[in-house]
Amino acid sequence: STGINMAESPLKQKITASMKDAMRAKDKPRLGAIRLALSDIKQVEVDERIDPDDARIITILDKMVKQRRESIRQYGAAERQELADLEQQEIEVLQEFLPQALSEIELAELIEKAITETGAENMKDMGKVMGIVRPQVVGRADMSAVSAEVKSLLG
């Protein structure tokens, strides 16, 4: 695609504008994280031949945050704190483009509501509950924590 793409999502425009700001400010760590995000978005555009909307971009960024959390765990185990710190900086930059994180209370309320709506009673119903919760929390909560919370309530 050439020139200005009218279908470009507002979120992608915001990320691109932030990249330009980081370049002007010569903020290398921030610029690096933003370029990685744009690169992952571009990869989806090429692979799937789509212009991802905001929701799809949030999913991409959320996956990037998850990967970095996993890296931090591994670096922590290997006692490589400086590398863990770099990953944490990237997470902080990526989170600027994600919706406001849910509080534990908001998350618990969403899960309780989904359990009530589905009439879920035990672990067999977990898929139904997650099916309702997932779209509401993507990019706003750590899915492994959400899953653990649902398990504890249904278990």
Predicted region positions:
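Charged, compositionally biased, marginally structured helical/coil segments
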Residues: 5-155
